Design a protein with these regions (language model features):
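Active-site neighborhoods and metal-handling regions in enzymes and metal-associated proteins
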Residues: 1-335
Length: 335
């Protein structure tokens, strides 16, 4: 039976058990930290902060590691350094974090430089050292998911031994609980709904940005959708190579249009689902041939997915960019 629940939990039937999701994630992060011999982790990227604290990063914070950050020390609850006085709201909205562990950040922005940046990174580091000393792990390696040259120099003066913290977090996040798997299915359902909506909306004469705007409006109407990074609309000559953007270009009859729901975020779970449409006309035999070829590549790679295989095994089902399109190397075909 397919999942019998929707976007929101209700009283009379089982939905996503968010308490179980939070506990599962924190256990996996702690296990990864221990497995890599770390005494603590400093997490500055949104996906890692979300994983260990289950708190929401505002959109304007997401590309600026350090405006808010989290510290996970061995044997203790996560510490959240929230941007400014937003912590007041975190204490109300996220009671699973102890009140005393919600603090204001000593806001840092990646790559900051200049005299004022040194004063700020000193405050940032002093608070971090206090957390490590309180937990008795000051002399243990600190895993970091981000670092820049100013932090490196200041950490060295403070006697902090830092190392890779992104790999442990990626290992933790790679395995999904049954609840998390259902979350991904819900995201897939939202993407299916958007693509069906586009079959009703697309028509010649619309511009790419009009189509993108409709997609944004449609997606943000779903409960739990907190961010839509992009709705890519590439039409006609923009469809190949797919320029992965949108513009004021007018869609003409019979053209191919690629629509990509790029990083729709529902309760922290993301998408990347794209489909190709022939708008206002019938696909040519050449278009059908390309479609059949691409569909074969896709199905062959899906069939290769099973426990124990590597991403290399899956990628081997796809063609060589050098042989197929004459590119210089595989990186030129990155999408």
């Amino acid at each position: 039976m397919k999942e019998a629940f929707g976007y929101a939990n209700i009283e009379w039937k089982r939905g996503i058990d968010w308490d179980a999701v939070r506990a599962f994630r924190l256990d996996r992060a702690r296990d990864a930290m221990q497995r890599h011999g770390l005494g603590a982790m400093l997490l500055m990227y949104d996906e890692n902060i979300r994983y260990v604290t289950s708190t929401l990063t505002p959109g304007w914070n997401k590309l600026k590691p350090g405006l808010r950050y989290a510290v996970l020390v061995e044997g203790k609850d996560p510490i959240l350094y929230e941007q400014g006085d937003i912590g007041i709201h975190i204490k109300a909205h996220s009671p699973w974090i102890p009140q005393e562990n919600v603090r204001h950040s000593f806001a840092w922005i990646k790559g900051a430089a200049g005299p004022a940046s040194q004063m700020q990174v000193d405050k940032f580091t002093e608070a971090l050292v206090g957390d490590l000393e309180d937990a008795g792990v000051k002399d243990r390696p600190l895993g970091v998911d981000f670092i820049d040259i100013t932090m490196m120099q200041t950490f060295e003066r403070a006697g902090i031994t830092w190392t890779d913290g992104m790999t442990p977090m990626m290992e933790a996040r790679a395995v999904k609980s049954p609840d998390e798997q259902n979350c991904s299915r819900i995201v897939g359902s939202i993407c299916d709904a958007l693509h069906y909506e586009m079959t009703q909306f697309l028509r010649p004469g619309l511009t790419e940005n009009q189509v993108a705007a409709h997609g944004f409006e449609f997606l943000y109407s779903f409960p739990g959708v907190e961010d839509v990074e992009d709705v890519i609309v590439s039409s006609g000559p923009n469809a190949w190579p797919n320029w992965r953007n949108f513009s004021d270009r007018i869609i003409r009859p019979g053209e191919l249009v690629i629509i990509d729901v790029a990083a729709l975020t529902w309760n922290g779970f993301k998408s990347c689902v794209y489909r190709t449409y022939c708008v206002g006309g019938t696909p040519t035999d050449e278009m059908k041939q390309y479609y059949d070829t691409a569909l074969t590549w896709l199905r062959d790679s899906i069939d290769a997915v099973k426990p124990g295989v590597t991403t290399r095994d899956i990628a081997s089902k796809w063609p060589s960019a050098m042989d197929t399109w004459g590119y210089a190397d595989e990186d030129e075909a990155a999408a």
